[in-house]
């Protein structure tokens, strides 16, 4: 008994009350789904179901889908997530009730200047920024930017040839990460970099700092488990994005903008210039124009949204081609017929390539960019007989939808024919969501697809890809954040002939 402290009765009572209060604080929201009649895995106090993500969010979602069916409830800390897979419910959330109820994405923590980014901004600010940015992503503007991207397609081919000539296997992420970084820094900041050849460039170093993201990161966990800390972090200027990187990039945008405004030469067409033009347009009311902070936030978010997504998808696609030589050959035949003698790709013709489109779409089905997407419920609402309280995050498990055998027969098989002209009209648009859908879908979708297609055409004009001893077969994925390979994808790169176009 000597091991037990000799506290007074009052002290023991206070300790007991404190423990009960701590337990209640860590669990007070955890009875929500039981009240609503929605099943789901049992949450832990404070953590909810977050610790189950250690094996991967995809794996966790697939287990829940098999066990609970089309709808289930989970908790990230005390935050309730209603996970939905029914296409009609998805349509209501992402499209029909987007403006009235499900306008905003869930914000995970203190954002600083990045709260002005189009993918983070809320309600009226989001609508205004989205309206101002939308003309930037029209086919006409993308066509104007195509020569900039084409230039980096040539750099990509040169870099790949250097690696192929070494006779060693090539890390796809190194090659396509450099291409992705070059295109984004060029179109968002007007900066020309060969990032593979200049990895120490401050733009490259700071851009990569933005991209170190893990769902089990201690800082991210702290704001998920203790959301009351977010305002404190904001006051202390501690944000989800590395301050040094954001400061460097925002100062660079400011400097480049000032330089362009002083320069009387005709500026080139890129995202940065188009945003500057929108600020100075007489057609835009001054109170509606992008502020300088908003302009800077968009430039930075383009890096965050575009680098990993493009480079990972291209890496996955080349892995698929290497392990499906029949698909690779058929795609090369289409490319050779469309652009004879390795002619440079053009914007309009690239968009019309049917088999290329099928291969890209099927790659994005098997390896979607994001594991999930979500919307925050702004008010109590009932949808298709389900009551959703205000503050609940409604989540769509994209990976689960894209691998559902009832929607996609033999979903683990790579079949571009699913997206042929004959078949794609039968696909429900609310079960294929690589870029989301509705008013808040990915604003850069067409840019991303154009960017990827150009890279694919340029490399397949000049090279073929084969598995090597370092290639992980079957490929395993890591889903603690974006979907990426568990191990780097290494492939053998073979010159198709001795002539290299654009290099």
From Swiss-Prot:
Keyword field contains Endoplasmic reticulum: yes
Induction comment from the UniProt entry of this chain: P450 can be induced to high levels in liver and other tissues by various foreign compounds, including drugs, pesticides, and carcinogens.
Classification via CDD domains: CYP3A (cd20650)
UniProt cofactor(s): heme
Pfam family name, one: p450
Annotated compartments: Endoplasmic reticulum membrane; Microsome membrane
InterPro entries on file: Cyt_P450, Cyt_P450_CS, Cyt_P450_E_CYP3A, Cyt_P450_E_grp-II, Cyt_P450_sf, Cytochrome_P450_3A
Domain of life of the source: Eukaryota
A Gene Ontology term for the protein's cellular component: endoplasmic reticulum membrane
Enzyme class: oxidoreductase
GO BP terms, alphabetized: oxidative demethylation; steroid metabolic process
Residues reported in the UniProt entry to bind heme: 442
Catalytic activity: an organic molecule + reduced [NADPH--hemoprotein reductase] + O2 = an alcohol + oxidized [NADPH--hemoprotein reductase] + H2O + H(+)
Keywords: Endoplasmic reticulum, Heme, Iron, Membrane, Metal-binding, Microsome, Monooxygenase, Oxidoreductase
Primary residence: endoplasmic reticulum
GO molecular function: heme binding; iron ion binding; monooxygenase activity; oxidoreductase activity, acting on paired donors, with incorporation or reduction of molecular oxygen, reduced flavin or flavoprotein as one donor, and incorporation of one atom of oxygen; testosterone 6-beta-hydroxylase activity
EC number: 1.14.14.1
Membrane topology value: Peripheral membrane protein
Family named by the database record: Belongs to the cytochrome P450 family.
Protein task: Cytochromes P450 are a group of heme-thiolate monooxygenases. In liver microsomes, this enzyme is involved in an NADPH-dependent electron transport pathway. It oxidizes a variety of structurally unrelated compounds, including steroids, fatty acids, and xenobiotics.
Protein name: Cytochrome P450 3A24
Lineage: Eukaryota, Metazoa, Chordata, Craniata, Vertebrata
């Amino acid at each position: 008994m000597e091991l037990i402290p000799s506290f007074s009765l009052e002290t023991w009572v206070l300790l007991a009350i404190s423990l009960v209060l701590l337990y209640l604080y860590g669990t007070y929201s955890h009875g929500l789904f039981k009240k609503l009649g929605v099943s789901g895995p049992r949450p832990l106090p404070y953590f909810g179901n977050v610790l189950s993500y250690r094996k991967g969010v995809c794996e966790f979602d697939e287990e829940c889908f098999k066990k609970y069916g089309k709808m289930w409830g989970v908790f990230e800390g005390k935050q309730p997530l209603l996970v939905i897979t029914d296409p009609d419910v998805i349509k209501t959330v992402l499209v029909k009730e987007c403006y009235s109820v499900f306008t905003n994405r869930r914000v995970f923590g203190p954002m600083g200047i990045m709260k002005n980014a189009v993918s983070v901004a809320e309600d009226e600010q989001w609508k205004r920024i989205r309206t101002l940015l939308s003309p930037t992503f029209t086919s006409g503007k993308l066509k104007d930017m195509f020569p900039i991207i084409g230039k980096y397609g040539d750099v990509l081919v040169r870099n790949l040839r250097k690696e192929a000539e070494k006779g060693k296997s090539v890390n796809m992420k190194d090659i396509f990460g450099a291409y992705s970084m070059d295109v984004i820094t060029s179109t968002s900041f007007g900066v020309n970099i060969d990032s593979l050849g200049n990895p120490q460039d401050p733009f490259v170093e700071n851009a990569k700092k933005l991209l170190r993201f893990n769902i089990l990161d201690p800082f991210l966990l702290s704001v998920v488990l203790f959301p009351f800390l977010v305002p404190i972090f904001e006051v202390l200027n501690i944000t989800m994005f590395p301050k040094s990187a954001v400061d460097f990039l925002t100062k660079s945008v400011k400097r480049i903008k000032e330089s362009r405004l002083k320069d009387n030469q005709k500026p080139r067409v890129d995202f940065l210039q188009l945003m500057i033009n929108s600020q100075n347009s007489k057609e835009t009311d001054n109170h509606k124009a992008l502020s300088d902070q908003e302009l800077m936030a968009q430039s930075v978010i383009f890096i965050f949204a575009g680098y990993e997504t493009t480079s990972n998808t291209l890496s996955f696609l080349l892995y698929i081609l290497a392990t499906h030589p029949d698909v690779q050959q058929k795609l090369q035949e289409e490319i050779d017929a469309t652009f004879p003698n390795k002619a440079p790709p053009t914007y309009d013709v690239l968009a019309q390539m049917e088999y290329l489109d099928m291969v890209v779409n099927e790659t994005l089905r098997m390896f979607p960019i994001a594991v999930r997407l979500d919307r925050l419920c702004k008010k109590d609402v009932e949808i298709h007989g389900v009551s959703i309280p205000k503050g609940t995050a409604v989540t769509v498990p994209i990976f689960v939808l894209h691998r559902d055998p009832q929607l996609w027969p033999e979903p683990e098989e790579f079949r571009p024919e699913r997206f042929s002209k004959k078949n794609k009209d039968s696909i429900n648009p609310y079960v294929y969501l690589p870029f989301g859908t509705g008013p808040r879908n990915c604003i850069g979708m067409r840019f991303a697809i154009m960017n990827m297609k150009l890279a694919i055409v340029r490399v397949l004009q000049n090279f073929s890809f084969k598995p090597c001893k370092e290639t992980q077969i079957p490929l395993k994925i890591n889903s603690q954040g974006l979907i990426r390979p568990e191990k780097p994808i290494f492939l053998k790169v073979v010159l198709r002939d001795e002539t290299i176009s654009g290099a």
